């Protein structure tokens, strides 16, 4: 999924002259954005420097290295917020040492939204402008937020449903912890500037074990080998289809299942029948509870902890057209 985002962002930077062939692009990522940025840099003759964690598996590691990416892996700590902060600190050190580097800032620069315009156009063309519901992991906010924004700007009635892991600060669930792990890519322990909270109508919070069951079902039932974030979105989309009276429900499958082979698919025997699962209905974030909660967000503003000091001082999120 991130390929369209990273590739279009790099193309725009080159068009604007903000980077030139031979320059180095830098960011923090331990997943599919790292791979997407490495592909874009490889295509356009740019250097790629990624600060990731030790959770990067051997398959991704080998791909990044062979694509010419310089990869630094920061050791994990017991605290996810500290992990993310350490990686950002290392990025800032690298920028100080290499002022000619360009920091992509995938979580804060809305240039990453541009690549989703053609996808929004395709959705609108295939559905003929019919009202629809989009379901997907929130993460950096670029994919779900941009698709909804571009479709709404074109006159399509879009209900936007975001999917989050427990423990994520983005929509105020940092007080509920998942004993297994936070699902990579769809939540965060630090604020993200690209998340436009007022775009979302409904939120689902889904635990690791529940997403495991959904990812397993997605493969068994539909032959789609996708990751945990895709499984979580699939589960939420099934529920939204159940409670909504009309209109198609489209969900975003962000990544393949390869990196989850050991953590998820080798544990398929522990998967529950998702037909037996239903979300707890929460009125506000104080009522969130494991393993699955659903709440109306009604396009409300960001919760207090989801905006950093840097964010509050910066300009509001602006969407590139």
Where are these regions (language model features)?
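A short, small-residue-rich loop immediately preceding and capping a beta-strand
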Residues: 20-53, 131-144
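Buried hydrophobic positions in well-ordered alpha/beta secondary-structure cores of metabolic enzymes
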Residues: 31, 41, 64, 104, ...
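Alpha-helix C-terminal capping segments
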Residues: 11-18, 35-47, 65-66, 148-154, ...
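Helix-rich "cap/lid" substructures immediately adjacent to catalytic or cofactor-binding pockets
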Residues: 1-23
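Active-site/ligand-binding loops adjacent to catalytic centers
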Residues: 88, 153-228, 264-321
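Catalytic phosphate/nucleotide-handling subdomain of diverse soluble enzymes
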Residues: 238-274, 281
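Glycine-rich ThDP/TPP pyrophosphate-binding loop and its adjacent helix/strand module
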Residues: 115-159
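Small/polar-residue-rich loop-to-helix segments that shape phosphate-bearing ligand pockets
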Residues: 54-133, 165-212, 296-297
